[in-house]
Amino acid sequence: MDTIAIPALNRPVDATVEIPGSKSITNRALLVAALAQGDSTLENALFSEDSEYFAKCVEQLGIPITLNPHLAQIQVSGKGGDIPAKQADLFVGLAGTAARFITALVALGNGEYRLDGVPRMRERPMGDLVTVLQNSGIKINFEGNSGFMPYTIYGQQFAGGHFRLKANQTSQQLSALLMIAPYAQQDTTIEVEGTLVSQSYVKMTCRLMADFGVDVTQTDDNQFHIKAGQRYQARHYTIEPDASNASYFFAAAAVTGGRVRVNHLTKQSCQGDILWLNVLEQMGCQVLEGEDYTEVIGPEQLQGIDVDMNDMSDLVQTLGAIAPYANSPVIIRNVEHIRYKETERIRAVVTELRRLGVKVEEFADGMKIEPTPINPAAIETYHDHRMAMAFAVTGLKTPGIVIQDPGCTAKTFPDYFTRFFKMIGQ
């Protein structure tokens, strides 16, 4: 297995970094551009395993896409809600967003569409989304367990109507239904039962739909109404840098007492993970905001924090990786749903922190991390890109940290380690 040794620094980080476009925005923009009538250009798009699986699936459905990674540009020739392909065998890898968005998209088609992914993808929850589609009259044939990949969807134009949806494990299913709803045969109302996790991603979806010309009415926190007959407008759209991926570079400033500036990303971002800046401020960092950048300056000593991370749950690993360097405990709450991500993320973070000698208490929905001197260790990443990226930051302050399977970052940030080593001057 490949490994990367992280060099511990005896000085603060001092760098300005450029971060590729947001994965979440790239995938949403790609879907609505595919549904729009005409040509859209997506600038600063993310090119990674996840986004490329998604783009390939859309192209297999008969919607022309031109990828230009050198310009970070995607051109989409939308078909106005039509799915030209009448049959497709679609593979999504481990891309949960692609899996859910493509599942919803083919419901607008009139054909036979098989979806599958890697073994871990077959374990990730799809049940509530496919149940809604079945309740709308769409036939789905499951090859294994009901509600899980692989399955074949027999598309017939999504009927719309009133649906109830559980979104306590992922909000991606809700986002998927929202984005196809304008092309339903009748108005659509989606009522979320119970807790809606990762609400910030749903807000992102609604904002992007509005940017492409479609309105969503939200009557309360858990009910959404979309009028049928609305249509996305093809357009030129610039995608902002990925706030989740920026978190690792800001964290590097935090643990080394240094300075990191990220261009083209501000607190006005539509991404929920921009809340990471608030967490760092509470831990003692200084956050400076310019017209088109954000800069984090780390303190001499990080402070502990007790934080609900439900709306920025992709950053649990980032906080976990720097928590041992705080002067008091770090408590992470309300993220039980991350047990169903690329890996069982709560257990993975707890296991690797204990491997480093850190005292950690695991909860059903989070963990408590005590300030602890860190021992050298090789970090298991569980094929999870965020484990690799987060624990690389730990190694900036403790000698002897090695990241196993660093190539797993290709899922969302293929050149992460190139940019990471450039940041630290190596």
UniProtKB/Swiss-Prot annotation:
Locate the residues binding 3-phosphoshikimate.
K23, S24, R28, T170, S171, Q172, S198, D314, K341
- Example GO biological process: amino acid biosynthetic process
Q: What is its EC number?
A: 2.5.1.19
Q: Which residues form the active site?
A: D314
Report the superkingdom from the record. Answer: Bacteria
Q: Which reaction does it catalyse?
A: 3-phosphoshikimate + phosphoenolpyruvate = 5-O-(1-carboxyvinyl)-3-phosphoshikimate + phosphate
Sorted UniProt keywords: Amino-acid biosynthesis, Aromatic amino acid biosynthesis, Cytoplasm, Transferase
Q: Where in the cell is it found?
A: Cytoplasm
Task: Tell me the residue numbers annotated for binding phosphoenolpyruvate.
Answer: K23, G96, R124, Q172, R345, R386, K411
Q: Which GO terms describe its cellular component?
A: cytoplasm
Q: Which PROSITE patterns match?
A: EPSP_SYNTHASE_1, EPSP_SYNTHASE_2
Under the heading Pfam families, the entry gives: EPSP_synthase
SUBUNIT field: Monomer.
Protein name per UniProt: 3-phosphoshikimate 1-carboxyvinyltransferase
